[in-house]
Structures are given as structure tokens and as C-alpha cells.
Amino acid sequence: MSDVASQIIELRPILPFAYARSQQILLLQRENDASLQTICVAQTPPAALLEARRIAGCSLRIERVTDEEFERQLVISYQRDSEEARRMMEDIGNEMDFYTLVEELPDSDDLLDADDDAPIIRLINAMLTEAIKNKASDIHIETYERYLLIRFRVDGVLREILRPQRKLASLLVSRIKVMAKLDIAEKRVPQDGRMALRVGGRAIDVRVSTLPSNYGERVVLRLLDKNSVKLDLELLGMSERNRQLLDSLIHRPHGIILVTGPTGSGKSTTLYAALSRLNASERNIMTVEDPIEYELEGIGQTQVNTKVDMTFARGLRAILRQDPDVVLVGEIRDGETAQIAVQASLTGHLVLSTLHTNSALGALSRLQDMGVEPFLLSTSLLGVLAQRLVRTLCSDCSQPQPVDPVQAEQMGIAPGTLLHNPVGCPQCSFTGYRGRIGIHELVLINDDVRAAIHRSDGEMAIAQILGGSRTTIRQDGLNKVLAGLTTWEEVIRVTKEE
């Protein structure tokens, strides 16, 4: 390593990498005397310099460098020094930081030609560690003509992390395919796999998806951190009313309960929390899933396998011969599965499942479109929970401000009402948000709604029947805005179809 690189690594960066890169500014603190140094380029926005000064709390010594020099110093300067990061890096036997490892990797274009693939393994371990530390749900590895792009999805939003040298693409992709037991020679078709890892002493399930593109394969890693999942209804962010109503529904002896929402809206977590609540020695609880995301002790879990014709419908039929009390169907995707689920609920089983619809009432028409007769649906359905995930405000930097009249009118609140707004600080990577919380709409199927379903009434007619007893998903979001948990912009972002 060069003397200049060694000197830079002695400096600890204060700003998150993504912010430092996008604003082209480095705020560095020397380890031994805590002095600060700022490195930027000619195009660095004045606002970024002011933000660096605000964070530092003092005047700064600014050094302007060329774009090329800034990129080099950006990569080699990022050392993670938190206790958690050090512990996790030690656990995986990795003495260097993710960004430094990228700089230090050997110049090899083909993993199969390398005598030692330990450096690339360390890089993947460091990348996974970095993703877990940032609470990322997905890692995107994208190959373009001139560069390789690595992005993390954090709190539902993609965030650029690093642009390593282009030649690392084949190294990373090949090694990941080996770890996921995929065919490394096959680069023409998409492949799916999974791997179970321990990173920093934590059990991580990783779903791997590869896709050919015009400049090489793209890879997406879905991270399932078994230590971070909240399998408790009281920890899902539901209002007290919705939580109590859902708790009463799942303790009914038979019927269907559905959870709806787009991909990544937390449906599986809600269902797992419900199963954990019901899990007891006197109940036989069984699931059919695609895939099994989290293993639940005391619950029989079966995974769909289309290669051997093990579909949701076939798995559900087999489960019903296993004397179950409660059945979880990971997703109702077709009419056959829907019909079997309805029949199961009518023969003394409690059935939990998910549907990809935008609203709770949309689940009713979707099931009828799948061929479920209205009289069967009205008899079997207990309730539908629609949900989304919104980012929560960072508790370290959010600030209350009076809402302007235009937004107040949109929200239906009094002008001047104090609402918390995102600001941005190092704790939240300058996004203003940290973590996510659910917003929900729970529709209970009462006698009036059953009669409407039996008559094949539309969603609007059923909404009128529910009237004021129904709290829509957007109204629940507004309640969380008023409580200072999130922002109206976040609620609108995830409920645009409302």
C-alpha cells in the first residue's frame, strides 16, 4: 500500500459513503489528534461544504483535488470503526474494510484462472457485512459498459454504495454463483439459487437471482436476517385497534384471513407474527411457502418446488391430509389454490394467505375473478388486512415545522399544525429516515358485508356499507404522520393508487 494511502487510512471519514460520493466531499478526522480535514473538487456544491462545517462544528481546512484523485481517496479512505463493524469483521476473519478490499483485489478477470480466490471471498463477506450493518434488504450488482455498480436497498429505497473497477464483475458474479450452487458456465439464461451464511455470528439466508444483460450478468441478493425479523404482532406498528381486531380474527376456529399488498410490503412478516402468536402444543400448524423465509420451531413448513410439480395447490392438498388446525399458504396465485383454500376453511381449518392487490377490498374481486363463487367467499372470508411500509423519521435529527396551508388542505388538518420533517444526519446517512413501520387497513367481514359479497356487489358499494367504521390505509398513515413517526410524503409515495 502506498504511503499516501496509509496516511489516508489513518483518517476516519465522518460522512456516509453515498453522501460523500454524490456531493464529492470527504470530511476526515485524524485518529490521534481528532483534527479535521476536508477534501473536495471544484464542482463540490457550496451547500455540501456548509453541511460539512455544520457537522464539524468548526471552520475547516479545505483541500481541493482533481476528480481522479478524489475518486481514489474516496475509495481508500473509508474505514468502518464502530464496535459492531469491528466485531463482525473479526468474526469473518476479515482485517480490511469493504471499500479498501475493492482497491486491493488482484487484477484477475477470471476466477477460474486465479490461484487463490480468498481475496474475492473476503470482498463478498465484507459486502454482506456492510449490507447487514446498513440493514439492507437487497444487494444489487449491476454490470455496465464502463463500470460495475453496487447498490443496497435500505428502507425500501435503493442507495448507491460503490462503483468498483469493471474487471471485478466476473470475479464477483462467478464466486456468488459457486456459493449459491449455480452453473457458473451458463451465462445465457437467468438462474435462481440460495445460500445460508453466518456473517458476524448472525444466520443469514440469501436468495440469489442472476439475469443476463448486454454487458454481463446482473445479480440481486435478497438478504433474510433471521436475527432482525420481528415475529410479534405488537412490534409491527399496528394501531391498538387493528392489532386487537387481528388478534381476535386469528383465534377464530376456521375461515380465511388474507394479507394484501405489493412485493416488499411486509406481508410475510405479518403472517409469521400471526403464526408465532398461535403456536402452541395443542395446535397443528402447517405451511406451504415459496420459499421458506424463516424457520419457525414447532411448525411444519413445506416449500414449493415447481421442478417436481410441487405447487401451492398440490402442497395444500397434501397438508389437508395431515390433520392441520391452522394452514398458511404463502400466496394464492391461481384459481385452483383459491378453491382449495376456500374449501379448507369451510371444513374446519383456519387458513392464512396473501394476495397481490392494492387494497383490502380489491381482494374480494380478485378471488371472484379467480373463480371463487360469491356464496362460498361470503361464507369463508373473515377479514382482509392491506398494508404498506413507510420509512420512519430519524429520531436524532427530525425537526417539527408548521405545515403549509396547501398541504394542510390535502391532509385535512388545520394550517400551522406542527409536523416532524426529515433533516438528515450521519446516523441516518443524511436521508432523514431510519427504519420502517407499517400502515394498515383492516376490513372485517360482518353480516352486511357478507350479504354484499353474496350479491356480487362492487368495491364501492361495500365501501359505503363499511362507512365510518373503516380506517383506510392512507388514514392510518396520516395518524402516524400526526404522531411524528413518518411524513405525509412517505404515505403518498406508498399509497399513490388510493
Curated annotation (Swiss-Prot):
User: EC no.?
Assistant: 7.4.2.8
Name of the protein in question: Type II secretion system protein E
Provide the species name.
Answer: Pectobacterium carotovorum subsp. carotovorum
Could you say which residues bind Zn(2+) here? 394, 397, 425, 428
Q: Where does ATP bind?
A: 261-268
Identify the gene encoding this protein. Answer: outE
Keyword terms of this UniProt record: ATP-binding, Cell inner membrane, Cell membrane, Membrane, Metal-binding, Nucleotide-binding, Protein transport, Translocase, Transport, Zinc
A GO cellular-component term linked to this record = type II protein secretion system complex
**Required cofactors, per record?**
Zn(2+)
Kindly indicate whether the keyword DNA repair belongs to this entry.
Answer: no
